[in-house]
């Protein structure tokens, strides 16, 4: 059924593109994602660099995880676990986690204190679970009130802390940019919006101890960095898979699965599904709903994560200077093209040759 649905989506999108004068859906998809300052060539160059220098680095972290777990061989099911004691969980009740978040933002900067006080005073954080509440977690913006709003379901896992860092990063940017009178400046491209959230995850690192016990603080810090690194090859794999699909819309479902299996060998060569038939036949991509619902929207996360790694290296050298740049990036919102925003903020473009190698060299010092 999933194969049948996706086949219809690919053919429909290809037909849309042809009616609009495109040879394939890909250029139309780029326009729909508002990519107005980079194109397929730049994305392909980014993926090439990831294959050359980032994949080997990520594979070394999988090997460290295998040794940490005490396994002779690590399978797909094993790699979801950080260490022999499982993955770190925060301490305290949901109310205490929210209070820790408030303390964190009060101490981080005057701007974040003002932001979080505004969120609390106006009840803009609906983060506690309750019966009949919808699942999920996200930040959205209420333009009539110039107010960010965060929705989540705290459940006692490290995901609760992720809400306090990642979603609050989105919300903080929305709060800072609220006074911009030009409405279109709020229409931020996804590759830019995710820099705000992913970078905040690193800027808040000195306060992780508020959410975890002493031992688990270090575990969470390492796990957070490891999983951010491990995501990059996967994100590129999702992107390259979609380019292949829309370049060859006539492919059968079986042929698409063969493409995925081939890409897994490039981006995640360690992968072993250990007898899970659905995944072994090349169907793992069907877990990624973006591929169905939001075509070509995934490399945005990779671009943003790489920029967040640049901020991490910067804050390790000079936290105040990195924070000043971050505030500037947030306030610029979408007033410039994405590549211009990076240049203005002092961040190297991930598309440029050598940037990803430099990022990996800095990350190697961390781990």
Q: Where do the language-model regions lie?
A:
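Contiguous, non-catalytic segments that form substrate-binding/exosite surfaces or channel walls
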Residues: 1-149, 348
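Glycine- and acidic
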Residues: 36-44, 79-90, 110, 145-158, ...
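Hydrophobic (often cysteine-bearing) scaffold residues that line and stabilize catalytic clefts
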Residues: 46, 50, 93, 97, ...
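Post-HExxH zinc-binding segment in Zn-dependent metallohydrolases
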Residues: 52-53, 177, 188-216, 224-225, ...
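Beta-strand segments within the central parallel beta-sheet cores of soluble alpha/beta enzyme folds
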Residues: 115-121, 185-186, 213-224, 255-257, ...
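C-terminal, non-catalytic "cap/extension" segments appended to globular domains
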Residues: 128, 164, 172, 199-202, ...
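Short alpha-helical catalytic segment bearing the HExxH-like zincin motif
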Residues: 159-167
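Catalytic Zn2+-binding segment of zinc metalloproteases
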Residues: 169-183, 203
């Amino acid at each position: 059924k999933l194969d049948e649905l996706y086949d219809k989506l690919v053919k429909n999108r290809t037909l849309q593109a042809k009616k609009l004068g495109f040879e394939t859906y890909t250029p139309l998809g780029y326009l729909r994602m508002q990519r107005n300052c980079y194109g397929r060539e730049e994305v392909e160059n980014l993926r090439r660099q990831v294959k050359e220098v980032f994949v080997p680095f990520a594979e070394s972290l999988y090997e460290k995880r295998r040794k940490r777990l005490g396994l002779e061989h690590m399978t797909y099911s094993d790699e979801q676990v950080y260490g022999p004691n499982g993955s770190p969980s925060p301490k305290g009740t949901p109310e205490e986690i929210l209070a820790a978040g408030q303390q964190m933002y009060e101490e981080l900067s005057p701007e974040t204190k003002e932001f979080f006080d505004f969120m609390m005073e106006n009840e803009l954080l609906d983060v506690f679970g309750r019966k009949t509440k919808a699942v999920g977690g996200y930040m959205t913006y209420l333009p009539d009130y110039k107010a960010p709003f965060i929705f989540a379901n705290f459940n006692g896992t490290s995901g609760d802390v992720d809400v306090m860092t990642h979603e609050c990063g989105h919300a903080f940017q929305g709060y800072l940019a609220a006074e911009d009178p030009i409405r279109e400046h709020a229409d931020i491209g996804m590759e830019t919006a995710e820099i705000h959230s992913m970078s905040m995850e690193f800027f808040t690192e000195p306060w992780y101890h508020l959410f975890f016990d002493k031992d688990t603080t270090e575990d969470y810090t390492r796990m957070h960095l490891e999983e951010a690194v491990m995501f990059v090859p996967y994100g590129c794999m999702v992107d390259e898979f979609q380019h292949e699909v829309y370049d060859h819309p006539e492919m059968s479902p079986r042929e698409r699965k063969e493409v995925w299996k081939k890409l897994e060998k490039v981006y995640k060569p360690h992968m072993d599904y250990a007898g899970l038939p659905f995944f072994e036949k090349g169907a793992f991509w069907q877990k990624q709903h973006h591929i169905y619902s939001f075509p070509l929207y995934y490399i945005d996360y990779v671009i943003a994560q790489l920029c967040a790694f640049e901020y991490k290296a910067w804050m390790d050298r000079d936290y105040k200077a990195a924070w000043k740049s971050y505030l500037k990036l947030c306030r610029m919102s979408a007033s410039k093209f994405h590549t211009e925003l990076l240049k203005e903020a002092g961040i190297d473009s991930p598309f440029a040759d050598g940037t990803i190698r430099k990022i990996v060299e800095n990350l190697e010092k961390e781990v």
